[in-house]
Amino acid sequence: MSRYWSPVVGTLSPYVPGEQPKLPDLIKLNTNENPYGPSPKVLQAIAAAAGDTLKLYPDPASDELRGAIAAAVGVQADQVFVGNGSDEVLAHVFMALFRHGRPVRFPDISYSFYPVYCGLYEIPYQVVPLTDDFRIDPADYQPGGQAAGGIIFPNPNAPTGRALTRDEVERIVTANPDTVVVVDEAYVDFGAESVAPLVDRHDNLLVVQTLSKSRSLAGLRVGFAVGNRALIDGLERVKNSFNSYPIDRLASAGAQAAMQDQAYFDRTRQAVMATRERMSADLRALGFDVLPSAANFVFARHPEHDAAQLAARLRERSILVRYFRQARIDQFLRITVGTDAQCEALIGALKKIFSL
């Protein structure tokens, strides 16, 4: 605490990122990184861009990157907004589109950055409980009285991994024509349906994605939003009031290559999905309750073993998983899908723990 802080700073409860330890030989299944490295074409593109032009500022509009994203997603380039990771994109969303003096609505169990942004920008919010089986129910987002200041949810949801169908998402969008509905699709490429094709049909729909997960670029920090031009223009106005150059030259080159290498993208995400199903079956065989997942992680609990203790005992065996000390989910572990060998090591460690 400092007497020099602005009043809002003391009220903030900042986001707590997943652990990024520097210890060697850890099996890291705690932050939903892709177990496969980026496309070789990404590394080639970054190497080619690492030249004398680094003395120059990058393109503030990121036109080439926006074009590559637009081509991959199936929209026009002026329907794309890019940022320094999807977290920055989301931060601009809250500032540009949600500050109406009315509560923003999002699930009670969801991405924990949402209430952080609300606190930072002094936006009121209302959490909407998931169902007893941890689903988002579109009926819970029907408007009642005054329109919400905004609606945002991940699809698939995080940390649960459960996904809505495209029709279910569209029900929420259609029911709230006077409210911007933001669908955070960080994990969509691992088995869910993107609603990006619907942005031409609904001017209140914004879709946010990241290259951190399915494109294996968590270390490069590139995210984007897709929506109608008026929403994108609002985001651009906030960006250019904050940082006109969020995407550096190396990140732009690597991200373009990642978006263009569809074959590598398909091959690695299919591998993750196949491993997820095997790991889920192995966990169930050990007695875990495992929620259906359309993400690159699973959410699981064991009826006879405390989740926090399990996480600690796995760490003793150099395996990291994510534990959330939060009501309703404090007996769950979120486990990132690793390589087959990493997931086999996890199952082996659990068997040893259970045999003690």
Curated annotation (Swiss-Prot):
Pathway(s) it belongs to: Amino-acid biosynthesis; L-histidine biosynthesis; L-histidine from 5-phospho-alpha-D-ribose 1-diphosphate: step 7/9
UniProt keyword Cytoplasm, yes or no: no
Domain of life assignment: Bacteria
Residues where N6-(pyridoxal phosphate)lysine is found: 213
One Pfam family here: Aminotran_1_2
Catalysis performed (reactions): L-histidinol phosphate + 2-oxoglutarate = 3-(imidazol-4-yl)-2-oxopropyl phosphate + L-glutamate
Classification via InterPro entries: Aminotrans_II_pyridoxalP_BS, Aminotransferase_I/II_large, HisP_aminotrans, HistidinolP_aminotransfase, PyrdxlP-dep_Trfase, PyrdxlP-dep_Trfase_major, PyrdxlP-dep_Trfase_small
Cofactor(s) the record lists: pyridoxal 5'-phosphate
GO annotation, biological process: L-histidine biosynthetic process
UniProt keywords, alphabetically: Amino-acid biosynthesis, Aminotransferase, Histidine biosynthesis, Pyridoxal phosphate, Transferase
GO terms assigned for molecular function: histidinol-phosphate transaminase activity; pyridoxal phosphate binding
Enzyme class: transferase
Entry's EC annotation: 2.6.1.9
Protein family membership: Belongs to the class-II pyridoxal-phosphate-dependent aminotransferase family. Histidinol-phosphate aminotransferase subfamily.
Quaternary organization: Homodimer.
NCBIfam families per UniProt: hisC (TIGR01141)
Protein name: Histidinol-phosphate aminotransferase 1
Gene name linked to the record: hisC1
